[in-house]
Amino acid sequence: MEIVFVSENENKIAEAREILLPLGFQSIFCGVTCRETGLTFTENAVLKAQAAVGSVKDVPIMADDSGICVDALNGMPGVLSSRWSQDGRNIDLLLWQMRDVPDVHRTAHFVCSIACVMPNTEVRTVSSVWHGRILHAPDGTGGFGYDPVFLPDGYSVSAAGLGSDLKNRISHRYKALRLMSSLLKRTYFSCHA
């Protein structure tokens, strides 16, 4: 089963590749520039997938928009996660904003929305979340983005310390890609095998 996964983020591409292959998908990865003007993760994922429609034919086109929502910051950075600070030091800004927040109020969750534009231009979307807490300092050397300061519920190390094998079986991106792959297998690929 072949799909196109659209992203300009090399880290997302690597994760998507690791997740999609065991789910039975051969993926072509494509970088398409798209302004993220949506107010939600789903709107941005749709914009990204639709941006590739003119350059790809006859296969479903998937795109991801994801980020972290911190309860003590009223859900921010949210859709602004990748551009939360002006200088790219997103973790530093987040930790500074959380400096006086006690542990009990450091709850957060990652969100991943996947949009898929079908060859007939029909759009399908799914979303998933991964709950946890914001640490007081970065921990771990793996992952990317906010992984070093995100402690997933039920774990004693940050997402950056889990290792890619475990992270890619429990994360928000894994859950969303698994949901979308199941949807595509039941609908599109059952008719286009």
UniProtKB/Swiss-Prot annotation:
<feature type="binding site">
    <location>
        <begin position="7"/>
        <end position="12"/>
    </location>
    <ligand>
        <name>substrate</name>
    </ligand>
</feature>
<keyword id="KW-0547">Nucleotide-binding</keyword>
<dbReference type="GO" id="GO:0046872">
    <property type="term" value="F:metal ion binding"/>
</dbReference>
<dbReference type="GO" id="GO:0035870">
    <property type="term" value="F:dITP diphosphatase activity"/>
</dbReference>
<dbReference type="InterPro" id="IPR029001">
    <property type="entry name" value="ITPase-like_fam"/>
</dbReference>
<dbReference type="GO" id="GO:0009117">
    <property type="term" value="P:nucleotide metabolic process"/>
</dbReference>
<feature type="binding site">
    <location>
        <begin position="144"/>
        <end position="147"/>
    </location>
    <ligand>
        <name>substrate</name>
    </ligand>
</feature>
<feature type="binding site">
    <location>
        <position position="66"/>
    </location>
    <ligand>
        <name>substrate</name>
    </ligand>
</feature>
<keyword id="KW-0546">Nucleotide metabolism</keyword>
<dbReference type="InterPro" id="IPR002637">
    <property type="entry name" value="RdgB/HAM1"/>
</dbReference>
<feature type="binding site">
    <location>
        <position position="167"/>
    </location>
    <ligand>
        <name>substrate</name>
    </ligand>
</feature>
<keyword id="KW-0479">Metal-binding</keyword>
<keyword id="KW-0378">Hydrolase</keyword>
<feature type="binding site">
    <location>
        <begin position="172"/>
        <end position="173"/>
    </location>
    <ligand>
        <name>substrate</name>
    </ligand>
</feature>
<protein>
    <recommendedName>
        <fullName>dITP/XTP pyrophosphatase</fullName>
        <ecNumber>3.6.1.66</ecNumber>
    </recommendedName>
</protein>
<feature type="active site" description="Proton acceptor">
    <location>
        <position position="65"/>
    </location>
</feature>
<dbReference type="GO" id="GO:0017111">
    <property type="term" value="F:ribonucleoside triphosphate phosphatase activity"/>
</dbReference>
<dbReference type="Pfam" id="PF01725">
    <property type="entry name" value="Ham1p_like"/>
</dbReference>
<dbReference type="GO" id="GO:0009146">
    <property type="term" value="P:purine nucleoside triphosphate catabolic process"/>
</dbReference>
<keyword id="KW-0460">Magnesium</keyword>
<dbReference type="GO" id="GO:0036220">
    <property type="term" value="F:ITP diphosphatase activity"/>
</dbReference>
<comment type="function">
    <text>Pyrophosphatase that catalyzes the hydrolysis of nucleoside triphosphates to their monophosphate derivatives, with a high preference for the non-canonical purine nucleotides XTP (xanthosine triphosphate), dITP (deoxyinosine triphosphate) and ITP. Seems to function as a house-cleaning enzyme that removes non-canonical purine nucleotides from the nucleotide pool, thus preventing their incorporation into DNA/RNA and avoiding chromosomal lesions.</text>
</comment>
<dbReference type="InterPro" id="IPR020922">
    <property type="entry name" value="dITP/XTP_pyrophosphatase"/>
</dbReference>
<comment type="similarity">
    <text>Belongs to the HAM1 NTPase family.</text>
</comment>
<dbReference type="GO" id="GO:0036222">
    <property type="term" value="F:XTP diphosphatase activity"/>
</dbReference>
<feature type="binding site">
    <location>
        <position position="65"/>
    </location>
    <ligand>
        <name>Mg(2+)</name>
    </ligand>
</feature>
<dbReference type="GO" id="GO:0005829">
    <property type="term" value="C:cytosol"/>
</dbReference>
<dbReference type="GO" id="GO:0000166">
    <property type="term" value="F:nucleotide binding"/>
</dbReference>
<comment type="subunit">
    <text>Homodimer.</text>
</comment>
